[in-house]
Amino acid sequence: MFKKILVPTDGSPLATQAAMEGIELAKKIGAEVVCVYVAKENQNSEFEFSDGKPQSWPTAKEYEEAVNHAAEQFMQPLRESAEAGNVKFTSETFISNTTAGYIVYAAEKNGCDLIYMASRGYTGWENFFMGGVASKVLAASQIPVLVYKVKKEQVPKKAKTYISPRI
């Protein structure tokens, strides 16, 4: 059976729901959990103006701190759920525009033998059957992937829009 399960999250309600189910599976079979959050790279290609003056962009260090803070907020309920079930929980955060690649990389690096992920995250119903990240992970991974299919009625009607962490 599985000994170490990777559960990626993007902080969306759907990814969080899938991660919680992955933690429940780990609890039932006595596995560890590795939680991964991959944030988009800081995109400073466009200027935003306020009162006719360009707004300041975060430095690389500020952006990394903001990403780590956001990741901790996303992972805290997952960590608490794992700890309540006596499941060993570790986490990693990456900054990259290749989310699927880093999910697979983290699973391999941490010796995971299962990736348990949502069928979609913040992209919502953009890809009707399965989200783009889930599809790419399935295509790239040599490790088994369990895709948690969210039922249509479970999708929030007015989901919050995700915005990359900014200072």
Regions found by a protein language model. Name each.
Residues 3-57, 81-85, 90, 153, ...:
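Small/aliphatic-rich secondary-structure junction motif
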Residues 18, 45-48, 101-104, 128, ...:
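Short, well-ordered secondary-structure micro-motifs
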Residues 21, 67-78, 102-104:
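Short, solvent-exposed amphipathic alpha-helices that sit
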Residues 42-43, 99, 124, 155:
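Generic structural signal for helix capping and beta-alpha/helix-loop junctions
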Residues 55-73:
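A short acidic, glycine-rich active-site loop
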Residues 80-115, 152-156, 161-167:
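Structural beta-alpha unit
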Residues 114-140, 154-156:
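Glycine-rich, Arg-bearing micro-motifs that act as flexible, cationic patches
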